[in-house]
Regions:
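C-terminal non-catalytic regions of proteins with extracellular/luminal or membrane-system context
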Residues: 2-274
Length: 274
């Protein structure tokens, strides 16, 4: 079953960008890992979409399982592992942790070790509050949602469709120090792609989704050429969140959903828009 889970994860992942054939990583590559998502791995959706598993392989785990193919700079890995563990101990849930500020000394050490960086971006996925626009401040809150919505608003200044300020700062830091920058997106839905689409400083982007207990290993195998990222996008990724017709009326009520876009839901809207 674990092999089936890993294979399904690999087949669903999508290679969104690969300039100059940076991926797959050559045999014997050295990489430096950045981003709390390296350890703050989200295996799947919350609420009714959640399942209990005996273990979870994050991206670091996956790469370490392939250490005959790739070597990891342990200093940055230790930094993010310790930070995420502290946040979990304080009650944070996967995908809802803060991106820590990267010390310049760690960045310099990593850059001396290799010219290849891997940034992991992760997002929690749950019903009712995971797709929030920045101007949507009127949603009613109740029970556990109250705390989660408050945390979401604090973490994601413009909504979780976009990078946070801390994530933007991290990306800028890493781009300034590395010739090859690979991004792994551990997300459950559509996100902003404008920040990497035309940026020559971002070499490759793997949409790894929330790929279950073996998701980290699946992503690592694709990064190192042990498989082909042949998945295709099943959704339309808009330039900005407001381009989706449902954004304007989303979260107006907890009791009902008002389809203000009429029948033009999803692909119907994008296929008929003038």
């Amino acid at each position: 079953h674990t092999q089936l889970s890993k294979n399904a994860a690999k087949e669903g992942m999508v290679l969104l960008k690969n300039d100059n054939h940076v991926l797959p990583l050559p045999m014997g590559s050295k990489v430096a890992l950045f981003g709390k998502g390296t350890f703050d791995y989200v295996k799947g959706g919350g609420g009714s979409g959640d399942v209990t598993v005996s273990y979870i392989h994050n991206l670091y785990d996956g790469l370490k399982m392939l250490q005959d193919n790739v070597s990891v700079y342990e200093e940055t890995a230790d930094f993010y592992r310790e930070n995420v563990e502290k946040q979990y101990a304080a009650g944070k849930v996967p995908g809802m942790t803060e991106e820590p500020k990267l010390p310049g000394k760690l960045l310099a050490g990593a850059a001396a070790y290799t010219d290849t960086a891997i940034i992991s971006i992760s997002r929690f996925s749950g019903e009712g509050w995971d797709r929030k626009a920045a101007e949507d401040q009127k949603r009613k809150k109740k029970s556990e949602d109250d705390r989660m919505v408050a945390e979401s608003e604090k973490l994601f200044e413009r909504g979780d469709f976009y990078l946070t300020k801390a994530e933007e700062a991290l990306v800028k830091q890493v781009k300034s120090a590395f010739r090859k920058v690979v991004v792994v997106m551990n997300v459950g839905g559509m996100v902003d792609t404008e920040w990497f689409k035309a940026d020559a400083g971002i070499s490759a982007v793997l949409m790894a989704w929330q790929a279950g207990m073996e998701g980290g290993l699946a992503a690592a195998e694709l990064l190192t050429g042990k498989g082909n990222p042949s998945g295709k996008l099943a959704d339309t990724f808009a330039r900005k969140l407001e381009d989706y017709p449902s954004t304007a009326g989303f979260h107006e009520s907890d009791e009902y959903v008002d389809y203000t876009e009429d029948i033009y839901v999803g692909y119907r809207y994008f296929e008929t828009i003038p």
